[in-house]
Swiss-Prot record:
Gene Ontology biological process: methylation; regulation of mitotic cell cycle spindle assembly checkpoint
Transmembrane segments: none
Disulfide bonds: none
Binding, S-adenosyl-L-methionine: 42, 82, 107, 131, 181-182, 208
Annotated GO CC locations: cytosol
Family listed: Belongs to the methyltransferase superfamily. LCMT family.
Catalytic activity entry: [phosphatase 2A protein]-C-terminal L-leucine + S-adenosyl-L-methionine = [phosphatase 2A protein]-C-terminal L-leucine methyl ester + S-adenosyl-L-homocysteine
Entry EC no(s): 2.1.1.233
UniProt keyword Transmembrane helix, yes or no: no
GO molecular function annotations of the record: protein C-terminal leucine carboxyl O-methyltransferase activity
Protein name as annotated: Leucine carboxyl methyltransferase 1
Signal peptide span: none
Organism: Caenorhabditis elegans
Organism lineage string: Eukaryota, Metazoa, Ecdysozoa, Nematoda, Chromadorea
Pfam families in the cross-refs: LCM
């Protein structure tokens, strides 16, 4: 799970696959590598039957082995809960407005939600993905690469032929993939303008372990930028939570060993801190749930029961500890 770690006495402490965001261009390679790690973990989880995703294989290396630490059930369960939660928020939003809505994924990595939505018949106006150019250029190559005997053609989900510009941007009617630094307001504005997003219709922004790599000032500025430009924005943010204990120190140490700094960790200390950030940016309705609440109350409990049976855990303490240190923030104006 991206930047997910557990306490130092846990066997999952080494299972950290992080989509990192940093202040240096030199860290782009690390971001790309950790995105690859996360994709492999998701691919492994889907192969175990946690959820169906016929598209993830286009981005994963099926010949690459997932490390033993990343094979632990807690990691796969964590990825499932996170993936299911974000998808539910987005589907509920699209259904609320009968598909007359847009989705913007910030720090998208190799996420496949667009294809999962469209293949299931979900209606939407536009789906825009944003990440560093080093990531989007690689994603474009995966999207456009020749189709293998057992692979799906990702281009079939597009409303029009894909047009690639500057090797890092792709535009295809209902789908857009753009390379931009989320901390650079002008760059982000210019790139979003090429997607011809409507600022007047409901738009949901999603971010998974993204804001935590930005300074508090930068993430708040991004949120204010969204509120000022879109009439009906919603935001769903997944990231670290309760970050003042030993659990987080272990995570920071693991990330620090790989040259990664969590510049926005102070905003993840508590629900109050998260609410304060979003309210200061102009969001009025803000709700914070940790992943234990998401797992036990928000997600389909029939699915939760099925997930529990895939790889039976001897005890739930480790998973509960992991879930206690991640949350979902949902916000509207």
């Amino acid at each position: 799970m991206d930047s997910e770690a557990v306490s130092s006495d846990s066997h999952v402490a080494a299972a950290i696959a992080t989509r990192r965001r940093s202040n240096s261009v030199s860290d782009d390679y690390s971001v790309q590598r950790t995105n690859d790690d996360a994709t492999q973990c998701k691919y492994f989880a889907t192969q175990k039957g946690y959820w169906k995703d016929e598209f993830i294989s286009r981005f994963a290396n099926s010949s690459s082995n997932v490390s033993e630490a990343r094979r632990f059930p807690e990691i796969s369960m964590g990825y499932w809960a996170r993936t299911a939660a974000i998808e539910k928020y987005v589907r509920d939003f699209l259904n609320e407005f009968d598909g007359n809505a847009q989705v913007v994924s910030l720090g998208c990595g190799f996420d496949t939600l667009f294809w999962r939505l469209v293949s299931s018949g979900a209606k939407l106006v536009k789906y825009v993905e944003v990440d560093f150019s080093s990531v989007t250029s690689k994603k474009i190559r995966h999207i456009l690469k020749p189709i293998g005997p057992n692979s799906v053609d990702l281009k079939k989900s597009f409303e029009s032929d894909a047009v690639v510009s500057h090797h890092a941007d792709l535009h295809a009617g209902n789908y857009h993939l753009i390379g931009a630094d989320l901390r650079q307001a002008n760059e982000l504005d210019q790139k979003l303008a090429t997607c011809q997003l409507s600022h007047d219709i409901p738009t949901i922004f999603i971010a998974e372990c993204v804001l935590v790599y930005m300074s508090a000032d930068s993430s708040t500025a991004l949120l204010k930028q969204i509120v000022s430009q879109f009439k009906q924005p919603a935001f769903v943010n997944y990231e670290q939570f309760r970050t003042s204990d030993a659990f987080t120190k272990v995570m920071e140490q693991n990330l620090g060993d790989r040259g990664i700094q969590l510049h926005g960790l102070e905003m993840c200390e508590s629900a109050e801190k998260q609410e304060e950030r979003f309210r200061n940016a102009g969001f009025k309705e803000v709700k914070v749930m940790d992943m234990n609440q998401i797992f036990n109350n928000f997600l389909d409990q029939k699915e939760v029961s099925r997930i529990r049976e895939i790889e039976m855990l001897d005890e739930m303490e480790l998973l509960q500890q992991l879930f206690a240190h991640y949350c979902v923030v949902s916000a509207r104006i």
